[in-house]
Amino acid sequence: MTLQATPLNAIHRALGARMVDFGGWDMPVNYGSQIEEHNAVRADAGMFDVSHMCVVDLSGIHARAFLRGLLANNIDKLQTPGKALYSCMLDEKGGVIDDLIVYFFAEDRFRLVVNASTAVGDIEWIQSRNTATGSGVTITPRRGDLAPACVSKLAIVAVQGPNARQKVYDAFPSTQPADTLKPFNAVVVHDAEMGELMVARTGYTGEDGFELVVPAENVAGIWEKLSASGVRPAGLGARDTLRLEAGMNLYGQDMDIHTSPLDAGLSWTVDLQSERDFIGKSALLASGQQKTFAGLILRDKGGVLRAHQKVITPAGDGEITSGTFSPSLSQSIAFARLPRDIAPGTEVQVEIRDRKLTATVVKLPFVRNGKALVS
């Protein structure tokens, strides 16, 4: 099978990146030391090519009403142009089709950013709901392989770390209006050289920074300018350890179509209080929360916490969904789905290669803004 490539593929290869098949995409896992890339984001600034993710623009006079029924979070929280919202998109059984970010620009114009591996299915689902509801919303993918020929294609670069925002301003003074943005807000600026740039104060690392949605034809120049400003390239390996430390779920690993968001630590993204109906609401109300989603820290030596390992608790068995060695904590950490009544501080046993090692249940996240929140 031929892998898909982002517009930055040649640059990754020129930098000597180790490339891997990531859900059908040829992506950099690291450019040398994964730990150094991780630490650069925690201490300074790093950048990630996330152009495999897909921007989907929604337009039309009924766009807000359509999203009210489509998403589990309350779209009516978005009243100020540029405001962003994290939400799950569910099926009728309450399973997670995808997790995404939705941006509000105007009453007839919203933007979704969806995961790479789910993009085709997401678009098909959104279109099917559009047809079923007669909403008349125009759905426009902007990723290179999915965008209509008449539409400009977009790429995404995430610049993350305590110095990330300043280094973006240094590289592109046109982005200075973003300096007043609060987290989960975005602004669109025009750069004389690079064109229209959407600058969003969002990320997937637990650090401050921006996600830049940019013209695909200009993303190589943007990457090079950021590099010249001292932003270090980082690959999928560091992205995974950073998001795990930050307590951020990965679709397909920590939740999927067979998982309720209530059992994936995502209750805060689900609006069950208002009278608004949405796809999957009835199923969630009927099932309620069945499991606890929590962090684990391995206390015994001799192993690393990994996905699918069994967790033995006083209330029954659970399972690790994601696990890694944390560079920031120098400990093995994980997410686990556990029996509902298991509380932080509980000691559990994890089966690792026919051994049972002790771990402690902790509240997520492990690290935020460079500071350890657990011990």
From Swiss-Prot:
It comes from the Bacteria. The keyword Transferase applies. The keyword Transferase applies. GO terms for cellular component: cytosol; glycine cleavage complex. Keywords: Aminotransferase, Transferase. It catalyses: N(6)-[(R)-S(8)-aminomethyldihydrolipoyl]-L-lysyl-[protein] + (6S)-5,6,7,8-tetrahydrofolate = N(6)-[(R)-dihydrolipoyl]-L-lysyl-[protein] + (6R)-5,10-methylene-5,6,7,8-tetrahydrofolate + NH4(+). Gene3D superfamilies: Aminomethyltransferase beta-barrel domains, Aminomethyltransferase fragment, Probable tRNA modification gtpase trme, domain 1. One of its GO terms (molecular function) is aminomethyltransferase activity. GO terms for biological process: glycine decarboxylation via glycine cleavage system. Its EC number is 2.1.2.10. Belongs to the GcvT family. NCBIfam families: gcvT, PRK00389.1. The glycine cleavage system catalyzes the degradation of glycine. The glycine cleavage system is composed of four proteins: P, T, L and H. This is Aminomethyltransferase. It comes from Cupriavidus metallidurans (strain ATCC 43123 / DSM 2839 / NBRC 102507 / CH34). The gene is gcvT.
